[in-house]
A protein has these predicted regions:
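Extracellular/periplasmic, surface-exposed regions of secreted and cell-surface proteins
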Residues: 1-185
């Protein structure tokens, strides 16, 4: 029997700043076009993104007389990009095999059948490959609205996306059945 235990931690952090705008027509053909001070109505933007992922995993392999084989694993992943209450996912798998060719009743076939193994497996995997902050509603500073408030006009912002408080792990389950065999090896 063999046993494997492990963990991993992943952290991504990104920051950016940008100034954009338009220069007047007279600066398009001059080398000073790249001078930021000539930008008309500059727009400053910046962003910060931080994501983390914590994982724990284990695997056990068991072999009895090299004929009966078992492999089982469990992975637990926690991701900051998913919604509260859905951040952790658990992904088990199991595989079994029977090397039929090593059984006593197969002895008469050993001169031409070197290997005959039946196998089956089942497992699930998870994916949290989405952008950060999709669980939160987003408001874009460019989406201004104007409305009357008392005796004046006030500006406001409207959400560009609604947050999704149900974002969870995308889970894929797979099954595998097979026969391995070898002749005159």
């Amino acid at each position: 029997m063999t046993l494997l235990l492990g963990s991993s931690t992943k952290r991504n952090e990104a920051r950016s700043s940008q100034v954009s705008g338009y220069a007047s027509a007279e600066h398009y053909y001059k080398s000073s076009f790249y001078d930021v001070s000539l930008i008309k109505t500059p727009v400053n933007t910046s962003s910060y993104t931080k994501t983390t992922m914590q994982s724990y995993f284990g695997r056990v392999n068991y072999s009895y007389k090299s004929k009966y084989l078992l492999a089982a694993s469990l992975r637990a992943d926690g991701s900051s990009v998913l919604a509260k209450g859905h951040k952790w996912g658990y992904f088990p798998s199991v595989a079994v095999a029977w090397r039929v060719s090593d059984e006593n009743f197969m002895e008469s076939t050993r001169d031409w059948l070197d290997n005959l193994k039946l196998r089956a497996s089942w497992g699930s995997t998870g994916n949290a490959g989405i952008s950060a902050y999709q669980t939160l509603p987003m408001v874009n500073a460019d989406n201004q609205i104007y409305y009357e408030f008392g005796s004046g006009v006030t500006t406001g912002r409207i959400p560009t996306t609604l947050g999704n408080e149900n974002l969870t792990w995308e889970t894929t389950t797979s099954y595998n059945f097979g026969v391995d065999f070898g002749f005159w090896g």
